[in-house]
A protein has these predicted regions:
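Short beta-strands within extracellular/lumenal beta-sheet-rich domains
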Residues: 431-445, 484-488
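Solvent-exposed beta-strand/loop surfaces of large extracellular or lumenal domains
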Residues: 466-489
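An acidic-aromatic loop/edge-strand motif
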Residues: 40-53, 337-391, 477, 490-545
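Bacterial N-terminal signal peptides that target proteins for export
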Residues: 1-7
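Aromatic-lined ligand-binding clefts that engage carbohydrates, nucleic acids, or primary amines
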Residues: 404, 442-468, 503
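Conserved, well-structured interaction surfaces
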Residues: 21-219, 224-354, 443, 531-576, ...
Length: 586
């Protein structure tokens, strides 16, 4: 994009109200999650790193560097509150950051309002309706499009499977399937129209300074949607999206009819997720703008040019980096510790004897009270249970564990098999109980590390205690056999001391409903890293995630299908939408 010459930021949303001598310009913004906007305000600074977008950032902030409050742009936003997929909660006010998917996020509305008001020099009202995960072919289906029907190519496949198949309902269930489609069709189209009517019927409710004598003008509509249709292979088989073009043309006609605005300027925000990929879908989205009946009042704005390739390149590296730093140790395919992993030499075990020589004392118990028993299979099995009498303080240093079983870790049972790794040989056997209580003692000579962590192998959740104090709880599960890395904060580390330390763990086993043999493995150790070794590790990790990658990721707060939650991307999109609307009006 070429640099945009702008006036000072103060002129974009001036601090004194503009006269309502001219009609209030009302713009409608509608779509799904990318119209909601998942760009966190924490990514604003990244906009200023690029000289081409720096002026946009200046327009988005006030003199104190805070998100600008536009004194002459108001907004009513429906769909971003509560359950963002279905709720009809409304948020109103003067336009600023926080009218995105959450109070700390923006979508296209922020810069759309800033730049439309700047150019038109009249007060602006934005009516935004957006719900996540909603399609045009069902949820926003326009009335004139007719009943949802399967494409012939898909119907031909269904006809071959009257008894049903994967993704194909049985013949006797298809009437109900169609009824469900019909019931869902157009629900969010109607909600959109109803909300626009509600707001325009009583504009003062949203815009207290509205001049009723001057009135208002429906000045434009922006449609920014598409992801759920893009990935719907049933409705659009074989990458053919002609039906989307047909539906969108009906949508434009119906919106204009239902809002009594036959020439309402209409902007199609062409989905740009993944940049210049998804060519067939992007062409189908843009196609209505080329129809003769829409010439001069419908325009397609391609958002692919705003895709950030630096962020796109960095995000997969971030995933790899996170996997490395969240893993303390890996296992070989035979379940033994992989001592050749290149990242393992920087963190060192704390205390003696060394973890592999340390003796644990342990006992297993079962849930006996009704409230503690799981009546059906649940992937998340970890829970607290009532322990047998006398074991309430089992994790404290003074507890007498002399009658418990002794052995080295990992303590386990059964076969834990995942990701090509088979863990079925253990120095110590877990026993029959579902829950394991284990304790060990180690001596610490000095505390000269800069950071400390728990390195733990566990199939299910766990509590970890250090000298009687709980220092970590994990309630989920771990599919792949490996040692997780949990870096400890000051509140946890203060319980580590010179001399004798008692480390204790509470954990439970796992089973598969298709193979009811219970299995488990547990091992835990405290490890530390010096400042010098941390610097060496950070330098080594730059081969995975470079300083350039880290800088790019400052501009991201979400996944790629949400344009990385990048304010830089959404700011450019909103500005482009505003400029397109203004040009249509000219």
């Amino acid at each position: 994009m070429k640099p945009t010459v702008i006036l000072t930021a103060a002129l974009l949303c001036v601090l004194s109200p503009i006269s309502f001598a001219k009609p209030l310009k009302v713009f409608i913004l509608a779509g799904q999650s990318n119209m909601q906007g998942h760009a966190n305000t924490s990514t604003f600074d990244y906009i200023g790193k690029d000289p081409l977008t720096g002026p946009i950032l200046a327009a988005m902030r006030d003199a104190e560097g805070k998100p600008r409050v536009c004194e002459n742009v108001w907004i009513s936003s429906l769909g971003c509150g509560g359950n963002q997929y279905s709720d009809m909660l409304e948020k109103t006010g003067k336009l600023t950051a926080g009218f995105g998917a959450s109070d700390s996020e923006i979508g296209p509305e922020f810069t759309f309002g800033i730049y439309s008001e700047k150019t038109l020099k009249v007060p602006v009202l934005i009516i935004k309706t957006s719900w996540g995960g909603r399609s045009l072919n069902i949820d926003f289906r326009p009335p004139s499009a007719g009943q949802y029907q399967l494409p012939k190519a898909v119907q031909d496949v269904w006809d071959k499977y009257p008894l049903g198949s994967h993704g194909v309902p049985k013949l006797e269930d298809r009437k109900k399937w169609q009824e469900d489609k019909d019931a869902a069709s157009g629900v969010f189209y109607r909600a959109l129209i109803e909300h626009v009517r509600k707001v325009t019927k009583d504009i003062k409710r949203v815009c207290p300074e509205y001049d009723e004598k001057a009135g208002y003008e429906l000045a434009g509509f922006v449609w920014f949607q598409g992801f759920n249709d893009l990935v719907d292979g049933q409705t659009y088989p074989n990458g053919n999206y002609d039906e989307y073009s047909r539906l969108l043309a009906h949508f434009i006609r119906d919106v204009r009819k239902d809002l009594s605005a036959p020439k309402l300027p209409f902007v199609i925000g062409v989905l740009g997720v993944d940049g210049d990929k998804n060519v067939n879908f992007r062409k189908a989205m843009a196609a209505p703008a080329d129809m003769p009946e829409f010439k001069g009042n419908v325009v397609a704005v391609d958002t692919a040019p705003f895709w950030d390739h630096d962020i796109a390149a960095a995000q997969p590296k971030q995933v790899e980096y996170d996997a490395i730093v969240s893993t303390a140790h890996t296992l070989k395919i035979d379940g033994t510790l992989d001592k050749e992993r290149k990242w393992d030499g920087y963190w060192k075990p704390v205390g003696t004897p060394l973890p592999e020589e340390r003796i644990w004392r342990f006992a297993t118990v079962d849930a006996t009270e009704k409230k503690d028993i799981l009546e059906k299979y649940d992937g998340r099995r970890f829970r607290d249970i009532t322990l047998p009498a006398g074991m309430e303080n089992w994790h404290t240093p003074e507890f007498d564990d002399s009658k418990w079983t002794e052995g080295k870790a990992p303590i386990g049972k059964g076969v834990w098999k995942h990701s090509g790794i088979t863990l079925d040989k253990f120095p110590s056997t877990w026993g029959t109980g579902e829950f394991l209580l284990m304790r060990s003692t180690f001596e610490v000579e000095d505390l000269n590390c800069d950071s400390y962590r728990i390195a733990i192998l566990a199939r299910q959740g766990f509590h970890v205690y250090l000298n009687g104090q709980k220092i970590h709880t994990y309630i989920w599960w771990q599919d792949k056999p490996q040692y997780g890395s949990i870096v400890l904060g000051k509140e946890q580390i203060k319980h580590l001391k010179k001399g004798k330390n008692v480390l204790a763990v509470y954990a439970n086993d796992q089973y598969d409903p298709n193979s009811p043999e219970h299995y488990a493995a547990i091992d835990v150790r405290i490890e530390g890293i010096t400042k010098a070794d941390q610097e060496k590790l950070d330098l080594a990790l730059e081969e995975v995630l470079s300083p350039k990658d880290r800088e790019a990721l400052k501009g991201a707060s979400n996944a790629g299908y949400h344009y990385f939650g990048s304010a830089k991307i959404f700011a450019q999109i909103g500005k482009a939408f505003a400029e397109a609307i203004v040009n249509l009006k000219k």
